[in-house]
């Protein structure tokens, strides 16, 4: 980045952007990859850059499984601690500026090692923005879990999901992209997550 990156202490951050599962195993190659997901990359980059320039938190979350992962009883083998678990190169250039990278063994980033402990330290936090994939799985699960987590702790934190910066996969006749995106939008909104077309709608 040519612009200056502002870094704040975790306790001072008022906003945090989480980049979810924009890794090789979901976006480029592997049993669960859908390369069309990368079409949201141009919409994600400005969100990351703005976060870095204004001192918001920036966190990367990627899948990272082992042969013993119970999740693999329901999904084909993917992101087994290899190249598939790495952030795609278009976004990896920003990962070096991330405050932290988390690796998860489930479809909900809240349970990634260290996540809850970190969130409880973020006493100034007012907004969380989620970008990445998949809208109806890891984005939805994290968004709803965060909503409940913050409510339980009486933390008044807005959770924002920009529709142009999240995506899911498409398998004709099995998993329709549009239908599953729309269903996830509704489920998230019904639990108190703010859905916006783009981050331009967010003051």
Language model regions located:
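Active-site metal-binding loops of divalent metal-dependent hydrolases
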Residues: 22, 64, 165
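A short alpha/beta connector and helix-capping loop motif
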Residues: 13, 30-64
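Solvent-exposed loop/turn segments at secondary-structure junctions
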Residues: 65-67, 135
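Feature marks short, surface-exposed loop/turn motifs that line or immediately flank catalytic pockets
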Residues: 26, 67-68, 168-169
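Metal-dependent catalytic neighborhoods of phosphoester/phosphodiester hydrolases
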Residues: 69-74
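N-terminal nucleotide-binding beta1-loop-alpha1 segment
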Residues: 16-22
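Active-site-adjacent betaalpha module
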Residues: 1-16, 76-203
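Short acidic, Gly/Ser-rich segments with clustered Asp/Glu that frequently serve as metal-coordination loops
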Residues: 22-30
